């Protein structure tokens, strides 16, 4: 079923499909009236439209529904509800009467707001309608019969049915007829809730006295009713408290005139303010920790001295007249710089300076007199200000001396430093050790170990001290040149005897003619030796000496990263001397490394290999020899030429 079929109003097309006239909103609970009255200015009463109490009595009791329906937890409407325009007034009247008579129905906040608005406009109707207490008693008796407690179970009451309400009552009210739109200036001003109490406070016109008195009477009669459980049910809640507004009195302003006693007190305050020293200076002086009793005595003595030195001057009439009626005491500000001096003091100081002036002085007497007077005034002021400071400093010095004495005693006792005997490190591998013994003391009950002896071992060999080198005087440049010339001459002489090859005549080994001789090369300079490349290898060699078939010698050069492959020594004995570089040698199954000036051999019948592991070329001087007699016996051929 649609909404238009159930309603008495014929269906018509509207731009706004959410509301129809005379229909209660499904969520908001507002009832849209047929016509809205306008004021003299042509404005609609929007306050009454939005403060409509359509949801006031939606939870009222309905006797017929309660009798027919079984007890359920919640009721849901099966179809939307509609109301005719003719039945608006009756339904609204019945709902308002039943809501006033039934105390169990909670008052809607919209109703309370609308009633408060009427009261603020000055309507004659009461804010809250008085209720008969007999109705509460009768209803309590009826509800007591309905709700019964069986053990811990409680029967559930059926939910109250909803009822549709219109606003005919509000239309007929006097406020509605005399409606005029209010301006923002006519609205009640916002006043804070916490206002101070004062005799000049008056009640705000927004809440007239008549409405407030009626509200107080109703609240006094209708306080609270206790239910079956013994708890208080509050049926009325104050929505807004009466506000107070401050209104200016038309009475003449009352000025407080100071009395004679008040004047005297103010004069004393000004005097005390003028004679007080600077509080910041006192605080800075009192920052040292000093007993309060000593400070109070010192300050009292200093104040008496200051009174004798600088007596208080009488007040002038201008200072008394400056304190006006109703004004606070003027704050005396201290000017910067030194205070001005009186003319009498300057004159006296000038006379004394002229009397004591020495002849021949360059500066005039007046300047000297001014300086003397300034020094006197400064000394008087400094004495009064620093009297308390000097006393405090003396106390602080005494305290510091006591603290230093305590610290010295602590160091003697051994609080800051331990009494442990300090021992240099011991060479335990030389059997150096510490010998302890038990020390018994009358004051100490247990015996404590103490160091008896430290055993140290001296070196058997005496230390040889190196003597200081004698410092020779610097030689002159002539002597240095002569030494260089001598060295150059020696080199030239050596070069004259230096040769690439050395040939000489030697005896030849011959059994038949032992005196036979021959000429042979017996020496070479290595730079003059010409090296030859070995085929299929990176090695270079030069055969220098040969004695067939038993002996041979020469030089081998290996570049960086080169390697001589593994070869057998056979029946020869080989020896090598490293002239330059670093090599890695393998003899049989052993590998080792050698560098310059190293020598090694390869015995008969072993395999060997050589590898250059350095970054530069390696030079080796090699020799190999064989036993000819043994070779003949075994039937071995001539001397091999392998290198």
UniProtKB/Swiss-Prot annotation:
Complexes and interactors: Component of the inner kinetochore constitutive centromere-associated network (CCAN) (also known as central kinetochore Sim4 complex in fission yeast), which is composed of at least cnl2, cnp3, cnp20, fta1, fta2, fta3, fta4, fta6, fta7, mal2, mhf1, mhf2, mis6, mis15, mis17, sim4 and wip1.
Higher taxonomy: Eukaryota, Fungi, Dikarya, Ascomycota, Taphrinomycotina
The protein's role, per its UniProt record: Component of the kinetochore, a multiprotein complex that assembles on centromeric DNA and attaches chromosomes to spindle microtubules, mediating chromosome segregation and sister chromatid segregation during meiosis and mitosis. Component of the inner kinetochore constitutive centromere-associated network (CCAN), which serves as a structural platform for outer kinetochore assembly.
Stored Pfam families: CENP-C_C
Gene3D superfamilies per the UniProt record, alphabetical: Jelly Rolls
Biased composition (Polar residues): 235-261, 295-304, 313-322
A GO molecular-function descriptor: centromeric DNA binding
Family, as annotated: Belongs to the CENP-C/MIF2 family.
Name this polypeptide is given: Inner kinetochore subunit cnp3
Bias (Basic residues) ranges: 332-341, 360-370
Record has Cytoplasm as a keyword: no
Biased composition (Low complexity): 85-97, 104-125
DNA-binding region of this protein: 333-345
Matches recorded under InterPro entries: CENP-C/Mif2/cnp3 (IPR028386), Mif2/CENP-C_cupin (IPR025974), RmlC-like_jellyroll (IPR014710), RmlC_Cupin_sf (IPR011051)
